[in-house]
Amino acid sequence: MRYRHLGKSPLQVSELCLGTMMFADQTGFDEARRIVSHAREHGVNFIDTADVYSLGKSEHMVGELLKGQRDDWIVATKVGNKMGERPNEQRYSRTWVLRECDASLQRLGMDQVD
């Protein structure tokens, strides 16, 4: 696997990123565990999820799958898509973004994303 710097940071990420859009929806936990394991065995160290993937269930699953191996992965997530019916669910105020980032960290069971 080839690696590149993530932007101007010192982080080195695999050229392939494991996307988890279907985790917890069309991909169950056991199959997702096999996918993550296979990717890691082949040098993938970059995994991507989002708050809206399966309405947060993908983030929760990714957190469970990476327990005990968090230092082996560069984790990315995203916010910005509508997660509920409240009037300000899809706004980009500082308060909203920070709230959604905190919610993602809680679902992931992590202190930070990369």
What spans do the regions from the language model cover?
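N-terminal binding-site loop/beta-alpha segment at the start of enzyme catalytic domains
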Residues: 1-74
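Glycine/proline-rich, positively charged
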Residues: 27, 84-114
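Short C-terminal domain-edge/linker segments immediately following a structured domain
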Residues: 46-50, 77-79, 106-109
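Generic beta-strand or strand-like secondary-structure segments
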Residues: 61-65, 78, 96-103
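Structural motif corresponding to the early beta-alpha repeats
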Residues: 68-94
